[in-house]
Amino acid sequence: IQHAATRALKNGMTLKLLFDQLKDIRKEVQIPLVLMGYLNPIMQYGFKDFCRTCRETGIDGVIIPDLPFKDYMEEYRSIAEEQDVRIIMLITPETSEERIRLIDEHTDGFIYMVSSAAITGAQKDFNAQKQAYFQRIADMNLRNPRMIGFGISNKQTFETASAHAAGAIIGSKFVTLLDEEDGDTEKAADKLLEALKN
């Protein structure tokens, strides 16, 4: 995903261009929409302007992997809430129970459960240690639904994630398929659905 973000920036992608491309999306799409991106481009755009434009465009939430929870609480939470934009925080197997409960208390939308502290990418299945982590978080009875991401690329990983959470987040596999299909989103989406079924 990081490679895709770098390539997009090299090809001239900007937040302004993204919002221009999304301006009419709510005429066709009714499901919740969540953007994912790094903090630096958002700061260059202006955090308040970014949140306002998200609201105006119909974006429901934003995942900012490099936004520390402390900074979110101290500097960005009130701005996001004022614009009714949910900031989705990530947790990992190493995140303390205390931090997880704080994230659950002070955010809305869902909690992004990173399946491992390793980089994103395909895995054949989740080992017993990862499944124990998923169960440990489920047993916390959090207020927010949980979504599991990182390494979901086939039926096994998708079903395991879905059994332990409200759903799965699939990024790297889709980016890989987009590359294979020369940017044809329909073909890439069809191949992704096929991979998750078989």
Language-model region placement:
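Alpha-helix-loop-beta-strand connector modules within alpha/beta enzyme cores
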Residues: I1-V34, S78-T92, A128-R146, I152, ...
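Histidine/lysine/aspartate-rich catalytic loop segments that bind and position anionic ligands
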Residues: V85-G121
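Active-site-adjacent beta->alpha loops and helix N-cap segments on the catalytic face
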Residues: K10-I25, M43-K48, D66-E82, S96-R101, ...
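Glycine/proline-rich, positively charged
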Residues: L35-D66
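Glycine-rich phosphate-binding active-site loops on the catalytic face of alpha/beta enzymes
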Residues: T57-D71, Y112-A122, H164-D184
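Catalytic cores of alpha/beta
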Residues: T95-H106, N141, I152-A168
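Glycine-enriched alpha-helix->loop->beta-strand junction motifs that scaffold or abut catalytic
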Residues: C54-D60, A80-I87, E105-I111, A163-A168
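Hydrophobic faces of well-ordered beta-strands that scaffold small-molecule active sites
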Residues: L33-G37, V62-I64, I87-I91, I111-M113, ...
